[in-house]
């Protein structure tokens, strides 16, 4: 049996996951990080994208976070997300529609930097949701 650490994944709205995990993999601003039992204390901002957890049972679960922070303490891992969803609850059609809408908004920009930045952020978030859904499909194969 592998060593485990307690993991919490929470959003501003609710707790999404709480339990013992062998490994958590997330997209930090410095690059992808893998956190397991015995990892050094660590704090990093998270990029939008998938967060994978390998549970104590050996099952793997994937979550989508729109950004936030990853905190590693000696006894726990905390993912503090702006928005967090179980990847199984995500809808590919709505993610595709959001991506298309953001691409159209970017194409129609006339120079207002604020609207451009918002559209670029929406596009990055939609693309991250689609990457998360693709990770689920790969796992199912």
Swiss-Prot record:
Annotated Gene Ontology cellular component terms: plasma membrane; proton-transporting ATP synthase complex
Gene Ontology MF term list: ATP binding; proton-transporting ATP synthase activity, rotational mechanism
One matching Pfam family: ATP-synt_DE
Membrane topology recorded in Swiss-Prot or TrEMBL: Peripheral membrane protein
Record key words, sorted: ATP synthesis, Cell inner membrane, Cell membrane, CF(1), Hydrogen ion transport, Ion transport, Membrane, Transport
InterPro entries in alphabetical order: ATP_F1_dsu/esu_C_sf, ATP_synth_F1_dsu/esu, ATP_synth_F1_dsu/esu_N, ATP_synth_F1_esu_C, ATPsynth_dsu/esu_N
Domain of life: Bacteria
Family, similarity comment: Belongs to the ATPase epsilon chain family.
NCBIfam families named among the record's database cross-references: ATP_synt_epsi, PRK00571.1-4
Annotated protein name in UniProt: ATP synthase epsilon chain
Gene this chain is encoded by: atpC
């Amino acid at each position: 049996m592998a060593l485990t650490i307690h993991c919490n994944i929470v959003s501003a709205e609710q707790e999404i996951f709480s339990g013992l995990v062998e490994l958590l993999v997330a997209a930090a601003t410095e690059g992808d990080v893998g956190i397991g039992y015995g990892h050094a204390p660590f704090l990093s901002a998270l990029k939008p994208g998938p967060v994978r957890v390998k549970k104590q049972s050996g099952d793997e679960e994937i979550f989508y976070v729109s950004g936030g922070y990853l905190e590693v303490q000696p006894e726990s891992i905390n993912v503090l997300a702006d928005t967090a969803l179980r990847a199984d609850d995500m809808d590919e059609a709505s993610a595709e529609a959001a991506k298309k809408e953001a691409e159209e908004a970017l194409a129609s920009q006339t120079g207002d930097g604020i609207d451009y930045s918002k559209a670029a952020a929406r596009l990055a978030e939609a693309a991250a949701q689609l990457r998360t859904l693709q990770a689920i499909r790969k796992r199912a194969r």
